[in-house]
Amino acid sequence: MDQTAMRLQEYDPTCEWDVAFHPYANPLTTTDFWNNSGVWQGSGTSYINMYNLNVLTDYIQANYPLRDEKGNDTGAERFVILSEQGYSSNNGYRLQASALAYSYYIASYNPMVKAFEIRSYQDDANDGILCLGIAGKDAYNAYKYVDDPSDTAKTYMKNKHYWTDVRGGAAGWQDLRIPGYDGSEIAVNRYIYKDEMVYHNDVYEAKVP
């Protein structure tokens, strides 16, 4: 990213570029991305996934502010599109659902994130043993209800396993590490595009539940 940014700076200092990022768990076979090794806060981290996504957005904000023709900081932010991610259900449907909900909350409370796209709506044989799809699994309802303001959705998302799977003893989202979390309703205060990608006839097509 730094090399590309430097070239753009040389070519056109006012060029408005943004970032598309795939914050998969490492390795891909793991579901509990918050326990991945080599993932920590700070620019010295070995890997960036959803757990420390703010390392990426903070770095971009600090090092690559949008500037006008005179080189002055405009105060505007670049944005990040999380254009592909997904979590394996091989470690349990419930854990996959918790990982998806947790990562969506992390994305939703990060003001630089403007899109959150799921890799697979259905399991794809081309992915081998990963089983990243959500159709017919707990993760489908988690994704469907995570930012739905209806009473049904709110009740569904209050299932405590969404928190305790991430941190034992947690009593709510406020007990997890979600930068910027303030308890506000995502659907009311955040506007974030979401869809799944369905593999069909050798192309990926958008599908919204």
Identify the role of each PLM range.
Residues M1-R94:
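Noncatalytic carbohydrate-binding groove/subsite architecture in carbohydrate-active enzymes
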Residues N91-V208:
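Aromatic-rich peripheral "rim/lid" segments of glycoside hydrolase catalytic domains that contact
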